[in-house]
Amino acid sequence: MAVLYGSQTGNAEEVAEDLHRQIERMARRKEINVDATSVSAMNDFDPATLPLQKFVVFVTSTTGQGDPPDNMKAFWRFLLRRSLPLRTSLALTNFAVFGLGDSSYPKYNVVARKLYRRLEDLGGNPLVGLTSSLGDDQNPNGGYFAALDLWTDQLFHKLREACGGIGNGGHEPTAGAIDVDESKIVVERAERPEARASQFDLSKEIALCHRVLRATLGNQGQASAHAPVDSGDSDGGSKERPFFAQLRGNEMLTAPSHAQDVRAVSFDLHPRMCYSPGDVLGILPSQRGDLVAEFLARIGAREDEWVRLRCRKDGGSSGTSQDVIHLGTLFTHCLDCTSAAPRKYFFQIASFFTGVEDAMEREKLAELGSREGRDDLHQYCTRERRSLLECLQDFPSVSLPLEWVIQLCPKLQPRLFSISSACRDASEAENDRQSDRGAPIGGGVRCELTVAVVRYKTPWKREIEGLCSNYLRDLGVGSSVPVWVESGTLDFDHLLGPQPEESSASLGGEREACAILIGPGTGIAPFKSLVEHLVSAAEGGERARTMKILVFFGCRSRGKDYLHRSFWEECVRGSEIFASPGGFAAAFSRDQRGEVLTRASDGSVESRALGRAPAVDLPSYSTTNKFYVQDAIDACSKEVYDVMHLRRGSVYVAGSTGQMPRDVRAALAKVMVRHHGMGESEADEYIRRMEATKRYQVEAWG
């Protein structure tokens, strides 16, 4: 039996690991009869052996525009091969799929749905129906766990029936009933290697820590265990061997009196680290040194210690690692001990490592690690964002061995930021009249991000700071930051490629290189990159006269958080792509108004005030007097109709998940009702067709 996962941030991996542990316990207790079980990322499993598996359990999330996670993509491509015979390839294989999704996203659980149907097409026999296999983060009764608990009960019941075992009704053991596992690794203290005694190369030490973790603990949400570590010489770097970029600028974009600090953070990249509009910059943040030192003291370790990790028999990877790693590097750059909340398994294991006199702590830990304590765990850990350090402080009797600390500590996840500048080398930046930051130092490539510094209070009024945004906020010019370039989820190819010779304004005609860009707050970042590129590329050419770009930006107040205001005003003044029906519209929610800037035929900028429609004509999605981007779309509906329908332009939306993408979609559908005479269902279907042909794309984040 195999348990396989596709996981981008670690949640699907955690579910898969937990399922595997429960299945192994069932096998040890003779509740089911299986020869062997395994758990791995899908990319680390040989798909050609899938027909040999009697039972396979899949757990997957959905990323981007309905894309599979990185550690599932190769496996998924194999399953899509046309050479695989339908209805017979997996005729002897029983499968179950569980999807981790969020119904506030347009592509809710689409990867799990596609995987389920493809396995069925290949002849696989489903153990649990599709409708019971979809978890939703938006479920008020425990998020995706509400569906996972019921799905697990059904799965285990089917396994007992198929494998001839008898058990406890398919329920996870209650609090205190879980037997302790052996750790996957053994940790040995070591001396600092002589070869590294004279020079400490942080980039190499980080790469080595990642390699050792993969070799001993398996994939753990990082790159494939079988993939070579990047040398650092590739154009964009990599997660395991990032390029250390120099911080060039760290400028506050918002007024000091504004509630949120938003910054323009710029870097000098390697000369070969080119990027395109829509790409993202991956950043590996460092944890605060004082908190890491506090954590190491709590577990009885020191920052300057060196250790050797090896696999325990039958645990982790089949090989062993003899590489010695630095504990300070491991817990500062690779494992997240000060920000991410530990998983349920931490509490299960921690309950076995309390003092004999601390029965209350032991019972509470066991409860938090059980199904019965899942709601308490959600409140204590997830909603309150308690880190591993804080959990250990709350339970002072816990004394975990170092091997368990390393195994249970969440992996430090890189953060991805949309790049908000166009790619320019030193000579281009020097001559760019729009650049107020000059050329990169040393002939590199300039890269700018628009970063909102995350600070908020939990339901219990605890102050929380986002790890990466606050890390960037505190950096001084000249600091080195580990980064790499990745492709984003927004596809701008038809805007960046050659203009079609002929275009049709009919519904069925070829779309023109026109677009509507909707980016409230820092969602404007990828569109600033795109516009900066287009303005430069189209300047003085025929394309500038035929391409039309209509931008919608939203913020709270014109005088406090109008991000990159001078850039947008200069672009409208200097480029014909902002001539009508193009333009730049800004909605100021707390000012309860907006404005739209358009380039006039004489090169001047025309400004038109935007306000809410009369109360009798309030859009259905407007419930307050605030003026949002959807209200600006409503006020500019004629221009929106021209670009979106008559010119068959594309629509791109970026920003926070939740209500905004839904309200924007409703506003665009209303445009078709108003100007094309469609009914509401017709307009909804029109937007759906745009989504299917990638004319409507959404990049949203929580």
Model-derived features: where do they sit?
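FNR-like FAD-binding dehydrogenase module
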Residues: M1-G702
